[in-house]
């Protein structure tokens, strides 16, 4: 096989692998009999760099006034920075957030849930400390967090104590929040 053909094959494999790492971000407008026009964004799978752009593109594809905007969440989390960017966009554009009964919102997905003007959880929400790119030491945790999680959560109307509680849970572990905890954090 020629080296050019091998390079092309490797490039195609890398492109296929990279596309599957992105969250699935879908946006569509619908007409609801009792409410009127609604805009629905669905975010599922792993949140990765590039998902903000996919969400923005989907929102721009559906201009106009809507009676209600809802983001449906079913995500295993992923990039904290990307989730916070997406969350700010959802808040600025007036979305409510919903974790349906068949959905899960874990890890960085919590930042999308927090962004909703109105937050509804029918499924499961789980939290943990995000992994630090430079390792898991105290020094790398300070160096590896270029964002203010407590400040973000506070701006979204969520109890800032969620940030410190998330930090207490190792990245490889997960804590499923109870209905009481969701209420205490103002996530439901």
PLM regions and their residue ranges:
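STAS-typified acidic loop motif
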Residues: 22-54
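Charged, glycine-interspersed solvent-exposed loop segments at helix/strand-loop junctions
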Residues: 133-188
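Substrate-binding clefts and substrate-entry loops adjacent to catalytic sites
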Residues: 68-69, 93, 128-143
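Bacterial N-terminal signal peptides that target proteins for export
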Residues: 1-9
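Glycine-rich beta-to-alpha active-site loop
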Residues: 82, 91-133
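Second-shell loop/turn segments in exported
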Residues: 40-47, 72-78, 96-102, 134-140, ...
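Extracytoplasmic/secreted envelope proteins and their assembly/folding machinery
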Residues: 40, 44, 52-59, 83-87, ...
């Amino acid at each position: 096989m020629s080296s050019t053909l091998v390079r092309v094959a490797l490039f195609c494999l890398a492109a296929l692998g990279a596309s599957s790492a992105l969250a699935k971000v879908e946006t569509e407008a619908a007409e609801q009999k009792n409410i009127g026009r609604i805009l629905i964004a669905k975010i599922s799978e792993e949140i990765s760099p590039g998902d903000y752009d996919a969400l923005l593109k989907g929102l721009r594809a559906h201009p106009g006034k809507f009676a209600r905007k809802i983001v449906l969440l079913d995500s295993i989390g992923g990039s904290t920075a990307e989730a916070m960017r997406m969350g700010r966009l959802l808040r600025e554009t007036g979305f409510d957030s919903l974790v349906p009964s068949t959905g899960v919102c874990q890890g960085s997905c919590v930042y999308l849930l927090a962004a909703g003007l109105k937050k509804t959880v029918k499924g499961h929400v789980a939290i943990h400390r995000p992994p630090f790119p430079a390792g898991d030491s105290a020094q790398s945790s300070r160096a590896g967090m270029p964002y203010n999680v407590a400040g973000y959560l506070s701006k979204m109307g969520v109890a800032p104590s969620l940030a410190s509680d998330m930090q207490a849970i190792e990245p490889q572990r997960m804590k499923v929040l109870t209905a009481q905890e969701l209420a205490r954090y103002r996530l439901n």
